[in-house]
Every structure is written in structure tokens, then in C-alpha cells.
Amino acid sequence: MDEEYDVIVLGTGLKECILSGLLSVDGLKVLHMDRNDYYGGESSSLNLTQLWKRFRGSDTPEENLGASREYNVDMIPKFIMANGLLVQTLIHTDVTKYLNFKAVDGSFVYKKGKIYKVPATDVEALKSPLMGLFEKRRARKFFIYVQDYDEKDPKSHEGLDLSKVTAREIISKYGLEDDTIDFIGHALALHNDDDYLDQPAIDFVKRIKLYAESLARFQGGSPYIYPLYGLGELPQAFARLSAVYGGTYMLNKPECKVEFDGSGKAIGVTSAGETAKCKKVVCDPSYLSEKVKKVGKVTRAVCIMSHPIPDTNDAHSVQIILPQKQLGRKSDMYLFCCSYAHNVAPKGKYIAFVSAEAETDNPEEELKPGIELLGPTDEIFYHSYDTYVPTNIQEEDNCFISATYDATTHFESTVVDVLDMYTKITGKTLDLSVDLSAASAAAEN
């Protein structure tokens, strides 16, 4: 422990593991520590016994649920956009060789008590029961504009400067109805609330393009992929990457106290009486609680079922977004389901999660609209956690703290945080312009 490191990373959550991998590849000397004796921190996957211990305090799940080891239940359930930032990061670092992915069957949106497949192209818009005949034509024109839009080709802009025009203005140009705007903004562009409407349209259009391009990657029913054996595989894969490039890992290290010099700069980490020196500290909010502030709360139901979610074409894996307006909420609700098809449960079992930003203190009542879509459940667990963002000035204390994972069921916001932290730590932007055709994600069924 007496050595000096460029960076000490505390916590083995996905964000911390991606960063330690990227920094190790950059040639920095990295020490990675965790107070837990397992990888993943808040973003780990639990077997059935661990799940019971965490939520029920006892170690004896019902026998009819099957073998404990066949369960890998994500604590932060998120799917991966097939053409998104996480896949680009996986390919950029060659971490794909440690993982096996499988396409996700379905992507749905909730409207007036029913769920519908999310249309993402002009062709799908014409077939979708989400819209009436005239609205389909308007939506088709909008989708064609988005598909043809190329930032570098002014001819495709139709006279609109998307860095100045708001999303609301571009939507009104096509005369789209409120319900259509709802599913485009929330189920395609994946915005969590309606703030995006008054922001420049460029991000909105890019997000829809990303969805459509991801959908086209696998010709499947959704734009998402997901690792076999659950998301707990991801932190471990990036940890292996870090180790290959000389990173040092230490699990089960008690306390992990960050040490500061007289000017308030981080200079090392002490655990069990030994101090390792460093120039910078990277960690999740739990390691430096005095340098973060609470900004909200995520509430989630974890459900074990013996059937797929009704009305999803018997999908073995599926995302359903319940837009805020449909529920009279301030932010969206998310439904995520996976099963034995991704090796996260025994044959015939499905794991479903209903997640939302908490707006009340009653998760059972608040998550009801999502839970009602599931049909009968074998077991249901509720949990909530506070969300934090850093408040420190990194240049002054050399501490780089990740934000807590949000309620969304996709990884885009997570990786934006990671790439932003990478830039602050290294002073450079990570170039992800890699050949995406090299992806090893297999679109099996």
C-alpha cells in the first residue's frame, strides 16, 4: 500500500470500473478498491439467496422459485442501446471479448391504459395502431426528415438550424398531436421529462436517429441489447481490462478514507491503517458523502414471475416506457423485463422491474400503474434509494465523484456521466469514433 498512484478509484460500480479501465489503458497507474467483497457496488447482480438476504433478511427463498445460482437480478436494471455510447466504449476498449450479448425482444410505450410497440421509422409509423390515419402521415413525414437529417449536409436541414430551433418548434412544423409527441419524446428520444421541448432540437433529433440506427443493427424488435448473465458482468469485464493494463484491485477493504492535504487536495486513501498515495481520487457518492448533495430518489419494484408481460407478444425481454403525462406524473415510469433467455433466471421464470423517480413516499401506490401491467407475480420486493450529484470543485480537491444511477432503463445517461468525468480527470475527450461493424454482439434469438 506504500506506493504512489496516479488515480485511486473507490467502489466497483459500473461507472467506476469503466473509468479505471479507460485510465489504465491511457497508461495511468490505477489502484481500485472497494469496501465490499464483491464487484459491482450498487450496480451488482444478485442471486436468489442474496436477494432474500437484502430484502427479507432471511436466507430461505421458496423452493418452487428454482436454484438460487440461476438468478442474476440486476440492482440497477438497464438495457444497452445497440449503437449507443456504452457499445462504442465496449468496442473502443475491446471489452466485448469478455462478454456475450443478446438482442432484447421488444420496446413498447404505454398510452391510455394499453401498451403498443414503439414505431421508429416511417414504415412502422404507417402500421402503428398508436395513431389515426392522418396523424400517421404527419408522423411519417417527420420520421423521414429525421432519417434524412445529416449534420454535415445543409440540404437535409430544410432551412432549419437545429442548434437554434427548439424541439417544440420542429414538432409544431409537422403538426404532431400531443400523444404522438409523448411517445416520440419519451419512448424514442428517451427524455425523462418534457424539459427537452424548449431546448435546441439537435439533441432531440440525434436521439431519435440513435434509436432508429440501433433498431436497424439487429433487425430485431428493439434497439437494445443485454449481456447474458446480467449487468453484473459489465463491471467485472472493465475490471479485467484495467488489470490487463496494470491496474491493481483490492476488494473487501474496510473504511477507505480519503486523505487531504492542508489546501484540501486529495493525496491518498487509508484503509486498515495503511495509506496509498495518489494524485486524484475517483469514487461513487458513498465514499465522499460530504461532497455530494441529494437531488432525488429512485423507487423500484423487483418482481419474479412465471410468465412474460401480457400484450408484449410473449417477449422474453422487453422495455416499456410509461410517459409522465399518461400517468399525471412529473417524470416517466419504466418497466424492464428479462428472463431465462438472457440466463438471469431459471427456465420459465421472468424478472420484471418497475422504476421511477419517487414523487411520493409510498412506492407500492406510486408504482401501481406499472405493476398492474405485469399480471400475477410470484414475489415482489420494493426498494428506494436517494440520488446524489457531486457539489465539489474538482480542480480544487482532485476528487471526481460519479452521480447516482437514475431511474431510466437504458445506459445513455450513465455513459454521458462517465465520459464527462473522463474529460475532467484527463483533460481530453475520449474518441469513440470506432468501426461499429466490429461489434461482437450477436443478435441471437
Curated annotation (Swiss-Prot):
GO process terms (BP): protein transport; small GTPase-mediated signal transduction
Membrane-crossing residue ranges in chain numbering: none
Alphabetical list of SUPFAM superfamilies matching this protein: FAD-linked reductases, C-terminal domain, FAD/NAD(P)-binding domain
GO molecular function, a single term: Rab GDP-dissociation inhibitor activity
GO CC, alphabetical: apoplast
Keyword Signal: no
General function of this protein: Regulates the GDP/GTP exchange reaction of most RAB proteins by inhibiting the dissociation of GDP from them, and the subsequent binding of GTP.
UniProt-recorded name of the protein: Guanosine nucleotide diphosphate dissociation inhibitor At5g09550
Organism: Arabidopsis thaliana (Mouse-ear cress)
